[in-house]
Amino acid sequence: MSITAAQVNELRKATGAGLMDCKKALTETGGDHEQAVDYLRKKGLAAASKKSGRVATEGLVGSYIHAGGKIGVLVEVNCETDFVAKNENFQAFVKDIAMHIAAASPLYVRREEVDPDVLEREKAIYRAKAKESGKPDNIVEKIIEGQVNKFYADICLLEQPFVKDSDKTVQTYLNETIAAIGENISIRRFAKFTLGEGLAKKESDFAAEVAAAAGV
């Protein structure tokens, strides 16, 4: 059946979900408004965007240590109330995000944080490669757009596939947690530490070591 713009807008007002999510929900449920609301709630999409505008100043600084103490992560995740900060689901979310950062090594939380100069350099590389193919300019721009989105998905935490469920992104997991807990949650910042990173290891002279051991 055909889904009208009015149906999509009505569902969006009721749930706060995105337009494309609302359209998909209505399509999947045959245009039934109530079933579409339930569909979005099950997906963790209903009301998350409405809550996202509220200020979150409480929360936790979570940590994760991996590989015998050779990799460590600190992440700050904010919520609206101290009550939620003590919630087991919230604490599990913080732990999951710290673990994800350790495994996926993002550089930024969100795409808005990417240095514009870095982005422009990437675009220039993509544009040069795409033009070598001899494709029309409009196709080249679409190729560049796709490459930029892949670039964001590689380096931005919220756009990365979630390590415990690659069928969804970290953003989707965040939306699901917001919907389940009923409060705005925000991943503010993180830091990853790898033992010895940036240090130059002293290269040993094996022959000299043998000679020294032999007293030569």
Curated annotation (Swiss-Prot):
Region (Involved in Mg(2+) ion dislocation from EF-Tu): 81-84
Domain of life, source organism: Bacteria
GO cellular component: cytoplasm
GO molecular-function terms, A-Z: translation elongation factor activity
Protein location: Cytoplasm
Main location, first listed in the record: cytoplasm
The entry's keywords: Cytoplasm, Elongation factor, Protein biosynthesis
PANTHER family hit by this protein: ELONGATION FACTOR TS, ELONGATION FACTOR TS, MITOCHONDRIAL
Family: Belongs to the EF-Ts family.
Entry function: Associates with the EF-Tu.GDP complex and induces the exchange of GDP to GTP. It remains bound to the aminoacyl-tRNA.EF-Tu.GTP complex up to the GTP hydrolysis stage on the ribosome.
Name the UniProt record assigns to this protein: Elongation factor Ts
Species whose genome carries this gene: Geotalea uraniireducens (strain Rf4)
High-level lineage: Bacteria, Pseudomonadati, Thermodesulfobacteriota, Desulfuromonadia, Geobacterales
Name of encoding gene: tsf
